[in-house]
Amino acid sequence: MESTPFNRRQWTSLSLRVTAKELSLVNKNKSSTIVEIFSKYQKAAEEANMERKKNNTESLPQHFRRGTLSVLKKKWENPVAGAESHTDSLPNSSSDGGHTADHPPAEVTAKAAPGARADREEHTQPRSRFGSRPEAVTQCRYPRSEDSHDFKAQATESQNMENCLGDSRHEAEKPEMSENTETSGKIEKYNVPLNRLKMMFEKGEHSQNKSPWTQGRNAGGRRLSENSCSLDDLEIGAGHLSSSAFNSEKNESKRNLELPRLSETSIKDRMAKYQAAVSKQSSPASYASELKPSESKTHKWEQKENVPPGPEACSIHQEGSKVSATENSLVAHPVPAEDDTCNSQGRSEAQQPIYTKPLSPDARTSSLPESSPSKTAKKFQAPARESCVECQKTVYPMERLLANQQVFHISCFRCSYCNNKLSLGTYASLHGRIYCKPHFNQLFKSKGNYDEGFGHKQHKDLWASKGENEETLGRPAQPPSAGETPHSPGVEDAPIAKVGVLAASMEAKASSQREREENKPAETKKLRIAWPPPAEQGSSGSAPEEGFKVSKPKWPPEDEVCKTEAPEDVDLDLKKLRRSSSLKERSRPFTVAASFRTSSVKSPKPLSPSLRKGWSEPEPEQSEEFGGGTVTQTESPRPSREKESVGKSRWQSEEAEAEAEEAPRGRDGRSFELESESFIGNGASIAEDDVAPAQRSPLEPESPGWPGFGDTTTAKEFNQKSQDVGFWEGEVVRELSVEEQIKRNRYYDEDEDEE
């Protein structure tokens, strides 16, 4: 490739080769004439490129345009390659946007080369050339309208063929127009000021010099073939014309490829097509004449970089084509005699808006920023200001959380009870308040407490009063949160008041449960003094009362040293458990009494000395037997269960007799000992604990080894054994000594009354 500033022209032939291949691929099922025409055009383009190379070496850069025109004129004078060379120059005029108005004058200039040279020399100055271009356009239009009159006789024979072939040609041209608009437009745009304008001037002068009759004879067939797409394009409408303004170069090149064909269109169709082409040609030509001095550099830069035309140019072309389309719709079917007036009117109408359009790029640049702020304002327009239900501050989109038809900050979406942060999957709401699911279940669903939980009515007046006091003292931050909820749309004032009462009642409920749990140990201490309960309560099998609930820690049986009370306790527990129908009451000894097992096991430690002291004085035999029984039990607790039961029964019978004989003293001593035992085992007050050592102190020197022995062996071992074997031992004892236990319980009642 030679280093010339217009090497880009070779891209035209290359792009046209590509379009020929694409056309052959697209139009496989259609007529092959278009492909043949393209092949001829390719050859002509290659020859033109070779001649351009030769002329480029001979001519200077400023006279390079003349050399190009001479080469083109030679190709036009050639009858074989006239059409191809003409189309080679025509693609260089993309800004003209006209469909067919340029080709007939091309042939006219081919026959009048000297006049064309003179015209080119006259207009070497670009400014003068641009100024005279509209005049040249007007000059080249009048003879064309006359030529159309002359070709009536020639075209009548081939109207039907042209109408048939026009449709196929139009269909064949459509895909290429859509495919190659960008490539051809980019590459061919740079030749607008060079060849296209000169051709227009040559056409203008030659149309003045030549008679319309000779012009008609020479260019009639080609012009009619150019206008072959007669009514099809007009029927497409203004939208297609405006879109095809960009594709004008491609359409012109295709029509020039069809030059060898004969014309077959009717006069009316040809006139309509001709006027449409004239109006379209005048609008881009006049615009290009004023656009060139100011934007030739930008055009060259665009073509060098193969950049598609700028948005302003595109919009200008579209506007020009729209104006021409409106003019075409007005001048669709004129009378042949009115051609000149219609052409002049269309030209003046097309030029008037276009002379105002060179100002439009500036106006457009100013209007684009005006329109863009509106778009940006729409894009960045903040939505309606939203405030958080909890904190009443503005909620921005990134921290917005929509839950329960209310807007929250993500950080403010917390449980109103425990203030833990929640998400959409871990919250539950009631009357506009947000809770975590555990507290929602705990507050509103536990124990079937629906009325209180859901705020329909106060469940218990006691709890409500407690809750009001606690709400003012313990939790002053909750009423503001309850007051914030009215801002949410779905919450009313009455439910909010209910929710306040509800929260108070919930806290009252929780506090009452805690108080009950705290008070239970104290109650058990008081009630264990009255243990065992009366026989009527155990035999009745009624629902266990508070005293019975507290007596459960007595189970499992205490140390084997204290077998005097343990079998009876076990027996009563078992009877009550078996007679009570609820599983909850049966399982309660193993759940509620877990905390009291250790204390109940520790309580027998001082019992053996106290018992020994209480019964050793009146009946030494009883104490000896009891001592032997206890010693054997402690020494061999597991293998001697039968002996234990027999010893217990014997001891209980003797004990009953002893109680009958010496009631006042034995009862007093035993009652005080039992009191001291119970209070020491459960950590009772110190005043009552002092009574027990006073009772115990005389006996301690007699049996020094008993307390330690009971500590080390029996308490620890039996704590495990009683849990495992308690029920079995209870059954055996119950079968042996039911009556004695009833008697003993009655005696305990009398003891308590006496005390």
Curated annotation (Swiss-Prot):
The lineage of its organism: Eukaryota, Metazoa, Chordata, Craniata, Vertebrata. The modification N-acetylmethionine is found at M1. Residues 386-446 form the LIM zinc-binding domain. Disulfide bonds: none annotated. Keywords: Acetylation, Actin-binding, Cell junction, Cell membrane, Cell projection, Cholesterol metabolism, Cytoplasm, Cytoskeleton, LIM domain, Lipid metabolism, Membrane, Metal-binding, Phosphoprotein, Steroid metabolism, Sterol metabolism, Ubl conjugation, Zinc. Actin-binding protein involved in actin cytoskeleton regulation and dynamics. Increases the number and size of actin stress fibers and inhibits membrane ruffling. Inhibits actin filament depolymerization. Bundles actin filaments, delays filament nucleation and reduces formation of branched filaments. Acts as a negative regulator of primary cilium formation. Plays a role in cholesterol homeostasis. Influences plasma cholesterol levels through regulation of intestinal cholesterol absorption. Phosphorylation of the C-terminal region by MAPK1/MAPK3 reduces its association with F-actin and contributes to actin filament reorganization and enhanced cell motility. The modification Phosphoserine is found at residues 15, 132, 225, 230, 242, 263, 348, 360, 367, 372, 488, 600, 603, 608, 616, 697, 722, 737. It comes from Rattus norvegicus (Rat). This is LIM domain and actin-binding protein 1. Residues 88-97, 342-354, 363-375 have a biased composition (Polar residues).
